[in-house]
Amino acid sequence: MITDRVSDYLEKIEKSDVNAFIDVNSEKVLKEAEELEKNDDLKNKPLYGKIVAVKSNINVKGYKISCASKTLEKYVGTYDATVVKKLRSQGALIVGMTNMDEFAGGSSGETSCYGPTKNPAALDRIPGGSSSGSAAAVAADLCDMAIGSDTGGSIRNPASHCGIVGFKPSYGVVSRQGLCDLAMSFDQIGPLTKNAEDALVLTNAIKGIDRSDSTSLETPKFEKKDISNYKVGVVKEFMDVTDEKIRNEIEKGIEVFKDMGCKIVDLSYKYIDLALPTYYLINYVEFFSATRKYDGRRYGEFIEEACGEEVLRRILIGKHISEQEFSGKYYKKALQARKSMKKEMLGLFNSADLIVGPTVPKLPHKLGEDLSPMEMYAYDVLTVPTNICGICSGVVRCGNISGVPVGLQIQGAPLEDEKVLSAMIEFEKNY
């Protein structure tokens, strides 16, 4: 019975101490489960009875959509985002809203006004961010699967740290309608799951064109493909910036592709040093623009007065470099760099079907450890190129270091999501 499974998960959530959830409405989800059991029209849908957690920056009617910020602490969603409507239409149940870095501005899960999320795979360490609660909920078996958002690695970073699967679809594959945006030209909604097969199913369920999002695209259903004859690229610069222990685990993962019949191709990406400055300059400007609606008049509090330190830092820098005298010096140059980075990245796919390598260059730090902003941003150096270039990218578990999970990142060209998801599935089977 679906209601029994929901009750089991609710009990686990109640007992859990990882702080994965911000808002859970037991009465609401149990009532929805009872109604679902009576709905014969949904019984053959691919997500029938699946219990899904949703990141707290995606609108779900009747739940707190706080973005883990005091700014929106009292805001309750008045509608379902397009992805949530799609989940429900496929037979899924929403169990609750997950913790996250405030306004998705972080890589650790520590900037939430509700306190940090713990990593279920290593309880004394960060789970990664910003989709910290979604990743932790899946890793701690508090739901079947979860939805997160990825602006510069916010699905893939915590998936790697928590030892689960995460997938960032190509830009436009999934509608962003109902997402509280961090940086609209980077943001993409995607799945966090216990295995790669589920990532394929969940991506198919939520993707598709949406009149409410002009950037959204229609794509054929993604199917599992044979990857045995694929050329798999390994970028030297991605490996060079990665800690040796992680690199060793990733090299073992690369051997798995070789054993599957793939040809390994050595590649070079000369713009790795531009990744963080390009990403963050554009991010700051777009985030500053996105937060102007939080003025304390229409809903919520005035953001500059209510937000945390990292969010305020991004707003103030974004405001500064948006000013006319600085725009040409910083923002326009970042846009030029983005164009060069994208051209170079897309060129790599002329030599390879996929690019594989590390997801994050270092292990997650211990909860409460004091890191400078630049040390924190360094977590993103291998994930932001995906968002800058609009390509797709997934993460699967690839070993561990003293029990702390390591994730292998698999990247594909724009709209080659099917290839990446297929490679994730085959890697998991053969690892």
UniProtKB/Swiss-Prot annotation:
Subunit and partners: Heterotrimer of A, B and C subunits.
Recorded catalytic activity of this chain's protein: L-glutamyl-tRNA(Gln) + L-glutamine + ATP + H2O = L-glutaminyl-tRNA(Gln) + L-glutamate + ADP + phosphate + H(+)
CC annotations in GO: glutamyl-tRNA(Gln) amidotransferase complex
EC number, UniProt record: 6.3.5.7
Record keywords: ATP-binding, Ligase, Nucleotide-binding, Protein biosynthesis
Organism expressing this protein natively: Methanococcus maripaludis (strain C5 / ATCC BAA-1333)
Alphabetical list of InterPro entries matching this protein: Amidase (IPR000120), Amidase_CS (IPR020556), Amidase_dom (IPR023631), AS_sf (IPR036928), GatA (IPR004412)
Active site: K55 (charge relay system), S130 (charge relay system), S154 (acyl-ester intermediate)
NCBIfam families: gatA
EC main group: ligase
GO biological process: translation
Protein name stated in the entry: Glutamyl-tRNA(Gln) amidotransferase subunit A
Pfam family, one: Amidase
GO molecular function, one term: ATP binding
